[in-house]
Amino acid sequence: MGFEETELRLGLPGNGGTEEVLIRKRGFSETETGHEDESATTVDLMLNLSSKEAATTAAAAADPTDKHKTLPKEKTLLPADPAKPPAKTQVVGWPPVRSFRKNMLAVQKSVGEESEKNSSPNASFVKVSMDGAPYLRKVDLKMYKSYRELSDSLGKMFSSFTFGNCESQGMKDFMNESKLNDLLNSSDYVPTYEDKDGDWMLVGDVPWEMFVESCKRLRIMKGKEAIGLGLAPRAMAKCKNRS
């Protein structure tokens, strides 16, 4: 018997023959040869890549104007004229007012203007002040028909004060300087008014219709304070000019 037949080997029974083992196993030389081939291929690929990069770098350094040509073409993919964003709506006011609310306000405004126009020729409101009284009043002169009615109404408004009455014929009494001086020297209050010219005159110096048209404001002052205003000459001159 030979040595090979009696040699102990690790393996399954029946797997005899070294030829099969040699077929399934690679030797050291084959392994080294395979590694050398792979490294050579890798080196070749790296050399090819490095050579391309070197060529590109050299071309860019030689001609700097071609730098834009080597850039990626991502920018060319963008649209040349992008669509503009939609214009924002203009905010007129805040909070917003609905259309029916606007229409209602417009109607109310027009009605108010028409009522003022219609009431203006039929009304003549003037403010009334009195020396010593801490309040003002407003009266419509066209509601009265004479100086007597106006005097009674003013007496009720300022009930805590007393002042001389101006009757419908009071104009003739004011033209008399002696009676005018007696009235001004008394302790009673005298009604005066400011006309369109800005002059202060005594109430009753002109006819009632003319007084209603020219009166802008009424003031009830003490008779002694009305002496220095020089109302009588102006009243007589204006009355003569208007008559």
From Swiss-Prot:
Residues 123-223 form the PB1 domain. The keyword Signal does not apply. PROSITE patterns: PB1. One of its GO terms (biological process) is regulation of DNA-templated transcription. It comes from the Eukaryota. Residues 77-89 have a biased composition (Low complexity). Induction: By auxin. GO terms for cellular component: nucleus. A motif (EAR-like (transcriptional repression)) lies at residues 8-12. It is found in: Nucleus. The N-terminal half of the protein contains two conserved domains I and II. Domain I includes a slightly degenerated ERF-associated amphiphilic repression (EAR) motif which seems to be involved in the activity of transcriptional repression. Domain II is required for the correct degradation of the protein through the SCF-mediated ubiquitin-proteasome pathway. Interactions between Aux/IAA proteins and auxin response factors (ARFs) occur through their C-terminal dimerization domains III and IV. Belongs to the Aux/IAA family. Homodimers and heterodimers. Aux/IAA proteins are short-lived transcriptional factors that function as repressors of early auxin response genes at low auxin concentrations. Repression is thought to result from the interaction with auxin response factors (ARFs), proteins that bind to the auxin-responsive promoter element (AuxRE). Formation of heterodimers with ARF proteins may alter their ability to modulate early auxin response genes expression. This is Auxin-induced protein AUX28. It comes from Glycine max (Soybean).
